[in-house]
Each structure stands twice: as structure tokens, then as C-alpha cells.
Amino acid sequence: MLYTNDLQGTVDFYTQTLGFTCKSISKELDWASLTFGDIDIMVSLPNEHIPFDKANFTGSFYFLTNNADIFWEQLKDKTSICYPIEDFEYGMREFAIYDNNGYLLQFGHELAF
């Protein structure tokens, strides 16, 4: 579950920018379910008993793709970039962006050697 202070903005970012489909949204429960292929993500406003000002996840969400370059071309001019696409010595070609909440999203594919 990803917490957000802007449920509709997050649904819009994931659907309009990243290409997810909104499977379900409940304004009463302040919750939404999003899907992209085999990926399912749930987002919600934080519960009252959970202190939350902004995204504070200390890691990243890694999307392993068949071709990160395709996603890079689609996203590079529409998102906040953490680092541009590049090849890494550990055998991955990847890039990273921030979503509308500040969560770090990485996209990569394995390099053929």
C-alpha cells in the first residue's frame, strides 16, 4: 500500500503518465487499486492513526522490463528524473524517476553479454 496525500493526483499520475489502469477507486475509503500487466499497486490516504506528511519510503520500486529504453523515451520529458538511462557494470540498463509523491521508481532490463 502506498500512502499519498493526493489520491486522485496519484491515480492520474499512474494511469496517465505510467499507463496503469485503475481497477477500482473508492472515495469513501480513500483507496484505489491500479494495475499494469502483472503489477498491482494499491494507494490510499493514510489512516488517521498513521502519521504521514509525505512519502518516506527509504527504498525504491523496481520495474524489470524487456526494454527500459521504451519507458525512458515515454517518461523522460514528463517526470522528475532521479538519474537518466545508463548501463551499469552489474549487467543492467536502467533509469529512475520520482512519482508525484516522491516515491522512487526504477525501470531496467538485463544487458546481453
Set out the residue ranges of the language-model regions.
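Short, conserved charged micro-motifs
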Residues: G9, A68-W72
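Residue-level preference for alpha-helix termini and adjacent loops
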Residues: D6, D12, D87-G91
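Vicinal oxygen chelate
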Residues: T21-L64, W72-Y98, H109-F113
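Conserved active-site tyrosine of GNAT-family acetyltransferases
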Residues: T10, Y14-T15, L75, D99-G102
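N-terminal beta-strand motif that seeds the catalytic metal site of vicinal oxygen chelate
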Residues: M1-V11, G59-F61, L111-F113
